[in-house]
Amino acid sequence: MKTYGFVRGTMIAMACVAGFAATASLASPFGGAIQPRDLRCEYRVDPLGIDVVEPRLSWTLQSGQRGQVQTAYRILVAGDPKQLAGETGDLWDSGKVASDQSIQVPYAGAPLTSGMACYWKVQVWDKNGKPSAWSRPACWTMGFVGRDSWKAQWIGFDASRNRDPSGRKLDLSGAQWIWLPGENARNAAPVATRYFRREFTVPEDRDLASAVCAVAADNGFTMFLNGQQVCTGGSFKEAVTADLAKHVRKGANVVAIEAQNVGDGANPAGVLAMLVVRFKTGKPETIVTDGQWRSSDIAAAGWTDAGFNAEGWRNAEALGAEGIGPWGKVTVGPAELFLPPAQFLRKEFNVEKPVQRATVYASALGNYELHLNGRQVGDAYFAPGWTDYDVRVYYNTFDVTNQLKKGFNTLGGILADGWYSGHIGWGRLRDHYGKDTRFSAQLTIEYTDGSSETILTDKTWTAATGPILEGDFLMGETYDARKEMPGWSTPDFDDAAWKPVDVTDKLAIAIESYPSVLVRKFQEIKPLSVTPTKDGACIYDMGTNFAGFVRLKVQGAEPGRKIVLRFAERLNPDGTIYTTNLRGARAVDTYLCRGDGKEVWQPRFTFHGFQYVEVTGYPGTPGLDAITGIELTSDTPVVGRFACSDAMTNTLYHNVCQTQRANFIEVPTDCPQRDERLGWMGDAQIYVRTATFNTDVSAFFTKWMVDVEDAQLENGGFSDVSPRKVANGGGTAAWGDAGVICPWTIYTVYGDTRILARHYDAMQKWIDYCKGTTKGTLLRPAEGYGDWLSIKADTPKDVLATAYFAHSTRLVAQTAAVLGKVDDARTYHQLFEQIRDAFNKAYVSADGRVKGDTQTVYVLALAFDLLPKEKRPMAAQHLVDNIRDRDWHLSTGFVGTKDLMATLNAIGRTDVAYHLFHNETFPSWGFSIQHGATSIWERWDGWTPEKGFQDPGMNSFAHYSFGAVCEWMFRTIGGIDTQLAPTEAGGPAYKHIVIRPQMGG
């Protein structure tokens, strides 16, 4: 039996640092006195430029005396730090307020206006009525109060973004699905790898203009041209496109495709491809998959090369044209990527008087990096953040008082595509919100004489392109150091060759202060090893799977030397990097050397999900110090840590945290590596409670819930992803329910009633939408994603959808009660009871068996309180029996896994939960760890010894949904809970904390 020794001090510190509890019991330098600390405004420390006119103030408490509590507080807010030091609150003096409230205290002082600086501190009284010392002072500043306050114009350099007219789109006309003959490929081909090749000739007298391809496969493929790998993919719905021009040669050529059919058993398989070679004159050469291709089930040496002896290979079987079943229509993105350079924008201005305070407010349609007098402003990445730019855009606020100087100054911005016009999601699609990026900034200078001046983006700015040739989240960044412009954001720089900017006067959308935490560097990661490859490259193992990029160091390179960095989460059996699961994401960074000694470079406008880095083109033999990993994540403060005596459990916790950081980049995404990286709603609601144990995600989810409501459909259905991706679906059970579950979770953890009030109407619309889909039965239809990626356990979609309909309805009833909407609370509670009755009549038999008889149906029925009291023990036994019949293994997918372990606890079978937790055989958390996982896999069988890699169309190795078990780890192993019993609520925001570890194993 394994035992767990939780680090108790760390456990309690988590609760206190997060500001959840009004009590404190840690030893501290304050002795027996109680002391307020960690002051925050709107969830953040000293936030700049907020636009909340009644901001909420919070603090934590520390005392060396067990059982201490706050009994009263006094808050002072002043417009000047000197006044605050004199204990004068000219903006607000709350007076002594008898209350134990230490979070979400609303400001109730003088009206706040644009640009105002507010300094504040707090004093509290303990259980004996003894006052504390005043806290250290904190501050916040106001941004723009009022929608018409933004005066700056929106500028860009459109000439840098001219589309290449040669970028044609392929339509796969004439191509046919092919496979090895005689394998019944349209229905049930064996799980195996097959090989296909086709030779073609380029006449010696024709000059090449371009060569492009589009390839789709069921399930995955790697394509070669003349022996060189040119692209990989893993989807039959979206074709991967690639530029092949540098690989085509005059004379004999061969295109070769290695295709994999994966799955638990025989299933459809096929390859569909088109290659178009265009010449400077005359007709193009088009090669399509058809019966003339040669095929084999054996890959002999040299099979991808021209001149290979294909004796013994057979003609492929043509299965039918593009559009046939079971594959249907295939989406094809642009044949040639459009990756414009970053734009450099600048403006000189003169400061003639002493400066009191200087503040920059900056925004963009795209991503920007702000510079002033030769230095970057701030340390964040990907500002101003991701929104639905058809609805709103955020601005960020920076204090630049110390960067200004008397005389001439220069304000500059670097502008890249970002989420606005860069590649988002699958299909290599871009320009989701617009084609032309824009930058906007207002610099407000307040002088010591009381006067002020504002520098705005307008037509007087100038623009150019520079060393950043490409900057795209999915495709990577290309940087030519020979094109650097030293001093471009300083007054001494000569910008005579720069061009006038293009100007957009105003935007017809909301411009608001950024309410979340920006993306920043979390840590630097040193590689563990570097291994040379047979083709002259080197592969670095960073030791863990993370999101970010690498900093490159090189010395002694000649000017123009190209160093290429490719990124992957795993290695192939032959030691090469596994990139097939990236699908359409190129994920390549390229550095062209300056050639003047030591050079250091890192990207600005891209990130990747990876553990391995392939480096080619490096001069000489690179050492371990040639690259350093830079891990990025949204700057959600760490509030929880977990450690115990079991190595596997500690590794699992590391993997959970690693995956959370990798996917909490601006929004809660599904994965950081492939051509997706979207704010999938189902994943977010499954994981949000776990996230709160690890980091303070209050501001992060406050912002994202605005994205969720912005993406809500007119019929009340929530989008499957938020922010909205153009032409994406919605209204899906367990995914759309995030619009109810996430704000409720933020309320329960942080005591935030405003998030409930703000999104209450949207929550009601969701319930109305769900009810409308039932057509009077209160049973939702069998549609949606179901229990995504379960293991041979097909949970009926109508059961799952109806269970979630009931659950969300109950949460809306509870929300209404919190908001004081008594009639609404009664109405929704009655609706919940009606849905529960319908659920039982339709899906639950007399012996407590639920339709589908999967682990997930029992988890949902029990966790959501859908069963009558007499049937709960029966259903509980069915759940345990199902687990036993699978040799004590789980079969749940995303949805079922979320509540599986807590449900076992609730029915008194914590022993079974520990059994599942300890498993190291498939499927289990331990299985992936046994096979080298350093993050949470998307699939239980992302890789197995028997089958290798799973379907590359859906095979992320950094996907946090199954990491939701971490909530159970904190509640059960760590024993941190807010309930005295499974059915008894402990109040929001850790008003009452129960420390009760449940041992097992």
Regions found by a protein language model. Give the residues of each.
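Boundary at the C-terminal end of the N-terminal hydrophobic targeting segment
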Residues: A21-P29
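Extracellular/oxidizing-compartment recognition motifs
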Residues: P29-A117, K121-R674, G682-D683, A699-T702, ...
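Active-site-adjacent structural elements in folded domains
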Residues: A239-A242, F344, Y381, G427-R428, ...
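Active-site acid/base region of carbohydrate-active enzymes
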Residues: G366-N367, L456-T465, Y612, T621-N655, ...
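Non-catalytic C-terminal accessory modules of carbohydrate-active enzymes
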Residues: D431, K435-Q442, T454-G487, D492, ...
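Extracellular polysaccharide-recognition and catalytic grooves
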Residues: S845-M954
